[in-house]
Amino acid sequence: MRYSTKRYYTHRATDDGGPMAFRIPRPAPTTLDPQRLARAGLTTFFRIADEWELDAAQQMALLGLTSRTTFFRWKKALPSALSPDTLERLSHVFGIYKSLETLLPGAAAAGWVHRPNAAPLFEGRPALELMLGGVAGLFLVRAYLDGERGGDFA
């Protein structure tokens, strides 16, 4: 017996020694609306930036922007789409934020990015300094915090 692969996954299992087929409904394909993704991502980023007390230059560096005009346009009216680079940067910022909220209580989480850090990765510098260096710095800080949480970085 054949089942349509368009609507269902087919799974074969044994029941009392014989094969038994059953259908599992396939989830409907989803697409992310680039405009909704941009709005949600930047709205969340700007809230985190306010909580971390980042100035415009720091926010621009984290977003990978060189144009102040673009930055302030984004703050005033969110763009209709974001580049893959910007989405990756946002993902790392959100991961860092989540880890800090898990590891540290309240205001300590927000202040962590500004405080000098004795861990070898930071060499006595604040994590923010490494984060401002680009995607690689964001990745390293996120991986460090994921390790501190005891989780794997994925």
Predicted regions and their residues:
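Non-transmembrane "mature" sequence context
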Residues: M1-A154
